């Protein structure tokens, strides 16, 4: 009787403990998706057409640290960090990371704010969205806009951001606005 009880207790303990070891191994082997905003390392790679550096070693170092995706922060004149969208995507993917998103934006001119007609700025966005699509971006985030001085300017900016969002959606890209404390 004691032998049967001992055997039963051992089997119960083993079956209770076994899954923990399997879960621990699976958890250890799982790779997490962690992205980095390249604005965080702008001093190393340059940004917005200034102080351009070879960003490939920085991308490699970030991938080696375990990052799996990036958010660009240097879209300028149809390029990312001085490279075509296709070149930029290739360079990021070459180190095993994914191009996920980008921070970029274009404020409205005084004339556009006064008239409420932002069709000229939307031409810029047409090129911008096409470049982001070519780079493989899933998201575009506008990180900053000037603080509107009047309620009318605020409404114009709301209409503007909604128009950008609509164009992005039509291109299969998600769009957002990254607010700050001053807004």
Which residues make up each language-model segment?
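Hydrophobic, well-ordered secondary-structure segments
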Residues: 55, 154-157, 175
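Acidic/histidine-rich catalytic cores of soluble enzymes
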Residues: 69-70, 166-183
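A short small-residue
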Residues: 136-146
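Active-site cleft segment of glycoside hydrolase catalytic domains centered on the general acid/base Glu
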Residues: 147-168
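Bacterial Sec-dependent N-terminal signal peptides
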Residues: 1-28
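Surface-exposed cleft-lining segments at the edges of enzyme active sites
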Residues: 114-116, 144-153, 179-183
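N-terminal pre-domain/capping segments
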Residues: 2, 23-138, 173
């Amino acid at each position: 009787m004691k032998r049967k009880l001992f055997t039963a207790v051992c089997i119960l303990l083993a079956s209770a403990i076994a899954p923990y070891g399997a879960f621990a191994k699976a958890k250890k082997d799982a790779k997490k998706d962690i992205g980095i905003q390249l604005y965080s390392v702008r001093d190393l790679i340059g940004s917005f057409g200034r102080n351009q550096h070879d960003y490939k070693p920085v991308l490699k170092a970030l991938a080696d640290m375990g990052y799996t995706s990036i958010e660009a922060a240097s879209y300028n004149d149809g390029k990312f960090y001085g490279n075509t969208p296709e070149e930029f995507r290739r360079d990021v993917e070459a180190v095993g990371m994914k191009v996920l998103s980008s921070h970029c934006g274009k404020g409205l001119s005084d004339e556009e704010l006064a008239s409420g007609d932002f069709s000229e700025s939307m031409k810029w966005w047409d090129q911008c969205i096409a470049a982001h699509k070519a780079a493989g971006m899933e998201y575009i985030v506008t990180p900053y806009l000037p603080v509107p001085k009047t309620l009318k300017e605020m409404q114009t900016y709301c209409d503007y951001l909604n128009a950008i969002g609509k164009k992005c959606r039509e291109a299969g890209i998600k769009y957002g606005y990254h607010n700050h404390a001053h807004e």
